[in-house]
């Protein structure tokens, strides 16, 4: 082959390879930009409390029309995030919900962008230094009850991934102050990886997990991206996690099943609710996303594809608030 012809062919092949790499990166890693929340009438405010000599920061959305003795919803970010990222990764939906329903949406910052959850083998500083994140949440509750007249019987917490793991810790260690939790893309650590104190008290809980999560394995196992990167130790299966909380609440019968219409066929996933409420304790719910990944479902936004499918049949924030709305400390079934 003449030299010029060879160079032409090589250039074409190289160009095709570059385009293929760019296309592949775009498909797996690109996330459509999430538009900033539309102008709402409320305020986004900043605050801080001191825990063990460390200043801990948070921000909160106060709607224009705050409900009398408003509920309090903590939205907990994932690893390498902060309160700003928690707002963005939940698509600003909790701000919108706060505006409609009058609750206070709170977005705290973890210690060095992580939470000290129940996983003993988590490698980040919040865990290594045993940062008191349960105490942090407790002090924030005190702040909002005192300064914003929040209802201490209607305190809720949700979070994704590392934030979901902290929600579990609150359920286990702070059930007398948190009326309900909703962990997303998270399961309880296994016995060898467990570093929390179990109160043994039931708590209302909604668990939202995807069956094809490449980081938090639905059937249990090592928490790492595709089982290879960034290990946080092992977790038990989603079903075992649900069974633990259902057992605490005294639910022993089969769950009631509610399937969501599969309106978004392009997302390669389907969702259903499994509801346990036959016993004397609080409601326990699994929102199972068949084919779902390490993501936060929404009809119009999605996470990068490399962490799995984002279900578009439902709005996760709205479902979580719907679960929270009738839960109160000390009331029957909660």
Residue ranges of model-derived segments:
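A domain-start/cap signature at the N-terminus of enzymes
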Residues: 5-72, 90, 96-100, 129, ...
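Conserved beta-strand scaffold positions in the cores of enzyme catalytic domains, especially
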Residues: 46, 105-107, 286-288
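Serine-hydrolase catalytic machinery in alpha/beta-hydrolase-like enzymes
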Residues: 49-156, 165-173, 219, 296-307
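The conserved beta1-alpha1 loop
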Residues: 74-78, 185, 209-210, 290
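Acidic beta-to-alpha connecting loop that harbors the catalytic carboxylate
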Residues: 110, 211-214, 291-293
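A short acidic, glycine-rich active-site loop
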Residues: 125-131, 227-236, 307-311
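The feature captures the conserved acid-bearing segment of alpha/beta-hydrolase catalytic domains
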Residues: 179-266, 275-279
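C-terminal catalytic histidine-bearing segment of alpha/beta-hydrolase fold enzymes
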Residues: 205-208, 236, 246-334
């Amino acid at each position: 082959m003449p030299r010029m012809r060879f160079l032409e062919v090589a250039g074409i092949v190289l160009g095709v390879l570059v385009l293929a790499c760019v296309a592949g990166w775009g498909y797996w890693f690109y996330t459509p930009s999430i538009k900033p929340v539309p102008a709402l009438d409320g305020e986004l405010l900043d605050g801080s409390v001191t825990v063990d000599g460390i200043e801990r920061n948070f921000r909160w959305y106060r709607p224009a029309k705050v409900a009398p003795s408003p509920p309090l919803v903590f939205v907990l970010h994932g690893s390498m995030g902060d309160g700003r990222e928690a707002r963005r990764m939940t698509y600003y939906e909790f701000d919108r919900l706060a505006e409609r329903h009058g609750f206070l949406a709170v977005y705290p910052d973890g210690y060095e962008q992580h939470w000290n959850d129940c996983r003993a083998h988590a490698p980040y500083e919040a865990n290594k230094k045993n940062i008191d994140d349960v105490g942090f949440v407790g002090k924030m509750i005190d702040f909002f009850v005192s300064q914003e007249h929040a209802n201490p019987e209607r305190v809720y917490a949700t979070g994704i991934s590392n934030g979901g793991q902290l929600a579990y810790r609150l359920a286990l260690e702070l059930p007398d102050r948190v009326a309900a939790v909703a962990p997303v893309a998270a399961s309880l650590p296994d016995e060898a990886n467990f570093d929390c104190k179990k109160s043994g008290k039931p708590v209302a809980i909604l668990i939202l997990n995807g069956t094809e999560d490449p980081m938090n394995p639905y059937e249990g196992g090592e928490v790492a991206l595709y089982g290879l990167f960034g290990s946080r130790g092992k977790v038990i299966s989603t079903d075992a996690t649900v069974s633990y909380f259902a057992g605490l609440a005294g639910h022993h019968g089969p769950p009631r099943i509610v399937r969501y219409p599969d309106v978004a066929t392009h997302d390669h996933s389907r969702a259903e609710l499994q509801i346990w409420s036959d016993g004397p304790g609080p409601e326990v719910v699994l929102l199972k996303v068949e084919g779902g990944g390490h993501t936060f479902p929404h009809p119009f936004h999605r996470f990068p594809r490399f962490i799995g499918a984002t279900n578009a049949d439902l709005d996760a924030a709205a479902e979580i608030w719907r679960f929270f709305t009738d839960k109160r400390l000390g009331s029957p079934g909660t």
